[in-house]
């Protein structure tokens, strides 16, 4: 494989076949599809069979991002509102 440097905010390995990759955005804009596409692309630089992607956002997600996350099936979207609601439980 080609050697490259890419920024990944969070990476965790469960075992030799499974890992998670995450991107965190603390902005006033919703996270759009391009962020998800970039994270998915960066995760493919590794040879894990099972990849789980997480996007964390202060301001939520665009419809395009939500639709693609649902289509992909291995993506979890977490907004700041989700975190606050979870902490209130």
Predicted regions: what they are:
Residues 1-89:
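A cross-kingdom feature that marks ATP-driven nucleic-acid transaction machinery
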